[in-house]
Amino acid sequence: MGNAAAKKGSEQESVKEFLAKAKEDFLKKWENPAQNTAHLDQFERIKTLGTGSFGRVMLVKHKETGNHFAMKILDKQKVVKLKQIEHTLNEKRILQAVNFPFLVKLEFSFKDNSNLYMVMEYVPGGEMFSHLRRIGRFSEPHARFYAAQIVLTFEYLHSLDLIYRDLKPENLLIDQQGYIQVTDFGFAKRVKGRTWTLCGTPEYLAPEIILSKGYNKAVDWWALGVLIYEMAAGYPPFFADQPIQIYEKIVSGKVRFPSHFSSDLKDLLRNLLQVDLTKRFGNLKNGVNDIKNHKWFATTDWIAIYQRKVEAPFIPKFKGPGDTSNFDDYEEEEIRVSINEKCGKEFCEF
C-alpha cells in the first residue's frame, strides 16, 4: 500500500508543478492579449457549421496555407443588444491565453466595422451531442474516457481562476483521434471568489445559480455530474418541458438513476449532483482529487489521458480536410460589413 500512496503523492506534486508553470504562461497572455492577428480577406468562407443568437460559426480555408479553420463571426450590434459585451470580451481574452490538450485553440482574432471574428482550430468530428443522440447512450468506459478529459480540463481552468459555466454535449467537439475539444467560452469568466451572473443551459444549471446565490467553481463540478449522467443514460438527470419545472427538480436534491448504472457511478454522481456545497466533490478540501481518486475512475490513467495515449472508444468518420459531414446544414448568409464603424468603443479591447 505504501508504494501506491507514494506514487499518488508524487503524481499530485508533479500536477502542482505543471499547474504553476501553466499559470505563468496564462498570465503573460492574459495581461498582454494578442489583438488583430489576421484579416477577413485572408480566408475563403466555405460553409456554416452552426448558428447562434448573435452570430455563426463557419468553416473557412486560410488562402495562404490551405489550412481549414472554424471562424466564429459575431455581429457587434447584436452582441450589444443582447447585453453580451462583457461575455464576448471575456471569451476572446481567455481563449487567447489558455493552452490545454482538450481546449479548442484560438488561432487568430480580429474585427471590422460590423463584426468580431475568432478563428479556431477546426474539429471535424462534430459535436458529442450528435453522436450521443445517434448512439443513444455511451457505455460507462466510453463515458469515463470523456469525463476524465473534462476533469483534467476543469482542474486546469480552475487553477487559473477560470469558471467555464457552459458544459453540455453541444459544446464538446470530437477530434480525429476521438478526444474532446471544449469549445464556446462565451460564458467563461476569470473570477477569484464568487460571481452572480445567471447564465448557462437550464438542464446543466447548479442549484445555487438558480437560487440567485453567489456561486463559485463548484458549479462546473455539478455540471460534470449532469454531463456524466447524460452520457451514460442518454438523457439528462433533470428534464421537463419548461425551464421552471427543470429548476424545481434541480433544487429538490432528488435524482433517480437508470437500473443499468453501476454502484460506483451512482456514488460519484450523488457526490457531484450534491445540492449542499459543503459536501459537493470538487469543492472540498481535497479539491479535484476526491473526483480523480473515486472508485469509478479507478482504471483511469490520468497522465496517459493528458498525453492522449489512451485509445479512444470511438473515432468519428472523416473523409479528409474540410469534410463537414459530421455537422448539420444551415442556411447560408452573406457576411455584410458596414462602411461605418459600429460599437467601436464597446469592443476597443477586442
UniProtKB/Swiss-Prot annotation:
EC annotation from Swiss-Prot or TrEMBL: 2.7.11.11
Residues with lipidation of kind N-myristoyl glycine: 2
Residue positions where Deamidated asparagine is found in the record: 3
Membrane topology type: Lipid-anchor
A GO CC annotation given for this chain: nucleus
Nucleotide-binding is among the record's keywords: yes
Record-listed ATP binding positions: 49-57, 72, 121-127, 168-171
One GO term of the biological process aspect: cellular response to heat
Reaction(s) this enzyme catalyzes, per UniProt: L-seryl-[protein] + ATP = O-phospho-L-seryl-[protein] + ADP + H(+); L-threonyl-[protein] + ATP = O-phospho-L-threonyl-[protein] + ADP + H(+)
Regulation: Allosterically activated by various compounds, including ATP. Activated by cAMP; the nucleotide acts as a dynamic and allosteric activator by coupling the two lobes of apo PKA, enhancing the enzyme dynamics synchronously and priming it for catalysis.
Domain AGC-kinase C-terminal: from-to ranges: 298-350
Residue numbers carrying Phosphotyrosine: 330
Main location (coarse class): cytoplasm
Residues annotated as catalytic: 166
Molecular function per GO: ATP binding; cAMP-dependent protein kinase activity; protein kinase A regulatory subunit binding; protein serine kinase activity; protein serine/threonine kinase activity
PTM annotation (Phosphothreonine): residues: 48, 195, 197
Residues of the Protein kinase domain: 43-297
Gene3D superfamilies recorded: Phosphorylase Kinase, domain 1 (3.30.200.20), Transferase(Phosphotransferase) domain 1 (1.10.510.10)
Subunit relationships: A number of inactive tetrameric holoenzymes are produced by the combination of homo- or heterodimers of the different regulatory subunits associated with two catalytic subunits. cAMP causes the dissociation of the inactive holoenzyme into a dimer of regulatory subunits bound to four cAMP and two free monomeric catalytic subunits. The cAMP-dependent protein kinase catalytic subunit binds PJA2. Activates cAMP-sensitive PKAI and PKAII holoenzymes by interacting with regulatory subunit (R) of PKA, PRKAR1A/PKR1 and PRKAR2A/PKR2, respectively.
Similarity comment text for this entry: Belongs to the protein kinase superfamily. AGC Ser/Thr protein kinase family. cAMP subfamily.
Task of the protein: Phosphorylates a large number of substrates in the cytoplasm and the nucleus. Phosphorylates CDC25B, ABL1, NFKB1, CLDN3, PSMC5/RPT6, PJA2, RYR2, RORA, SOX9 and VASP. Regulates the abundance of compartmentalized pools of its regulatory subunits through phosphorylation of PJA2 which binds and ubiquitinates these subunits, leading to their subsequent proteolysis. RORA is activated by phosphorylation. Required for glucose-mediated adipogenic differentiation increase and osteogenic differentiation inhibition from osteoblasts. Involved in chondrogenesis by mediating phosphorylation of SOX9.
Protein name listed in UniProt: cAMP-dependent protein kinase catalytic subunit alpha
Organism of provenance: Canis lupus familiaris
Gene name of the record: PRKACA
